[in-house]
């Protein structure tokens, strides 16, 4: 319970009103992958020819990345889910902090700009508040390719070493299979002189999508999707047309929502092997899964407790840890969820407990005793995936829930509530202005009414 006082802090005015205990039924059209589209936008900086991207999701993160490119002089033309990108006349300049703040993917631009123009200045990025996501791997890798890098007042400034006109190939071994570092170094190496070998590379599908587009542009990249990636640098890259892969995280979120509500739905288009770890756990927890071509159907039933441990691809994705925890709160039995990727990605635990779940948390390991039902509440999501988890929990609850923090949700889910509505859920985006006290202390002098408002730290 948070007491409202005269020291007002206005929440974002939009929220979702959700009527719980409804069954999902029907088909969901899965959008293009956010995490792929963002890096493909950065990769468009590698050429002075036009890039046409199809199946681009309509998300606030994509809009932010587009604004970053525009600030550099890139011309963008968008129509529905297609983006035409013209990076011919780029002006190399330090990006304003207000543009990159809140979007970690903005840092992907450094590899592309450095290898094409010989210099780049990018402020340290933001993103969801889910823990430290250091850029050491990016910087060490770029230095191995021949870059001089300094960090001056939270701005990363990179340039070629003296008397060099290009980056040069190198053997690089990452200390951990960082997705962002792997993508940054692939882009930088694509126009470098000679061969680059990246060992302990990340294997995520979004990296494979990046490499497929770069190869269409004339790059020579081998073994993407494996732990060792080989890049032979080329002199120039040209334009191409490329379709963004389906969003495996969005698909997984809807599948988990169906399992949590004992529902039957079909998601498509998807690439089923991108979701293998998730599908295995859903089957283990009692759901029936049917794969046909580029579609996956699920029939949820009798939720059983299962343990998960997040891991780099092809392991269980950290982006679905929070939604899966919402499922496990109403499972029969005890389960354990271990987060190994980010050290601060359990903000949803307190919120789920306020809804009636039984979760104890220690050292990024959540121990969950399943309960029969959760109760509806007014909640504020603190990051993208925890917001999705709260919505799933609200779908299973006994009453009405109000979920705030939609600025997080809109970063990564396109038309989320509309898609749920088409499946039969009573959900509506509403606009109001409510206030909460920034302090967690109860104020006896408050003249404003108390609300059941819980916010993740």
Swiss-Prot record:
The modification 2-(S-cysteinyl)pyruvic acid O-phosphothioketal is found at residue 128. The active site is at 128 (proton donor). Pathway: Cell wall biogenesis; peptidoglycan biosynthesis. Keywords: Cell cycle, Cell division, Cell shape, Cell wall biogenesis/degradation, Cytoplasm, Peptidoglycan synthesis, Pyruvate, Transferase. UDP-N-acetyl-alpha-D-glucosamine binds at residues 104, 319, 341. The keyword Transmembrane does not apply. Phosphoenolpyruvate binds at residues 34-35. Residues 436-457 are annotated as: Disordered. Cell wall formation. Adds enolpyruvyl to UDP-N-acetylglucosamine. This is UDP-N-acetylglucosamine 1-carboxyvinyltransferase. It comes from Prochlorococcus marinus subsp. pastoris (strain CCMP1986 / NIES-2087 / MED4).
């Amino acid at each position: 319970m948070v007491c409202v006082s005269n020291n007002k802090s206005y929440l974002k005015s939009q929220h979702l009103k959700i009527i719980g205990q409804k069954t999902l039924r029907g088909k969901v059209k899965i959008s293009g992958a956010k995490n792929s589209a963002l890096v493909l936008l950065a990769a468009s900086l590698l050429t002075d020819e036009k890039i046409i991207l199809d199946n681009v999701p309509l998300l606030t993160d994509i809009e932010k990345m587009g604004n970053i490119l525009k600030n550099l002089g890139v011309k963008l033309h968008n129509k529905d889910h297609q983006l035409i990108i013209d990076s011919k006349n780029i002006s190399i300049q330090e990006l304003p902090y207000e543009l990159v703040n809140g979007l970690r993917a903005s840092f992907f631009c450094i590899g592309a700009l450095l290898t094409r123009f010989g210099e780049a200045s990018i402020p340290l990025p933001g993103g969801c508040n889910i823990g430290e996501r250091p850029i050491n791997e990016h910087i060490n890798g770029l230095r191995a390719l021949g870059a001089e890098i300094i960090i001056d007042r939270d701005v990363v400034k990179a340039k070629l070493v003296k008397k060099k006109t290009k980056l040069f190939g190198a053997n690089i071994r990452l200390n951990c299979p960082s997705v962002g570092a792997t993508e940054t170094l692939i882009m930088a190496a694509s126009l470098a002189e000679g061969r680059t070998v990246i060992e302990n590379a990340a294997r995520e599908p979004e990296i494979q999508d990046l490499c497929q587009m770069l190869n269409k542009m004339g790059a020579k990249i081998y073994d993407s999707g494996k732990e060792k990636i080989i890049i032979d640098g080329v002199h120039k890259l040209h334009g191409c047309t490329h379709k963004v892969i389906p969003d495996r995280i969005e698909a997984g979120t809807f599948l988990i929502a169906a399992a949590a509500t004992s529902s039957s739905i079909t998601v498509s288009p998807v690439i089923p092997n991108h979701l293998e770890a998730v599908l295995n756990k859903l089957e283990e927890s009692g759901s029936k899964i049917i794969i046909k071509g580029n579609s996956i159907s699920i029939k949820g039933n009798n939720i059983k407790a299962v343990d998960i441990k997040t891991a780099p691809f092809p392991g269980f994705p950290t982006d679905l840890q929070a939604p899966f925890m919402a499922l496990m709160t109403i499972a029969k039995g005890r389960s354990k969820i271990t987060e190994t990727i980010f050290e601060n990605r359990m903000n949803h635990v307190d919120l789920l407990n306020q809804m009636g779940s039984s979760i104890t948390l220690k050292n990024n390991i959540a121990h969950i005793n399943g309960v029969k039902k959760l109760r509806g509440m007014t909640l504020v999501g603190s990051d993208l995936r925890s917001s999705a988890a709260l919505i799933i929990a609200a779908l299973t609850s006994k009453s009405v829930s109000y979920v705030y923090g939609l600025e997080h949700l809109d970063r990564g889910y396109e038309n989320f509530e509309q898609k749920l509505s088409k499946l039969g859920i009573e959900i509506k985006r509403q606009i109001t202005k409510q206030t909460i006290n920034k302090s967690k202390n109860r104020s006896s002098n408050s003249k404003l009414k108390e609300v059941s408002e819980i916010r993740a730290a």
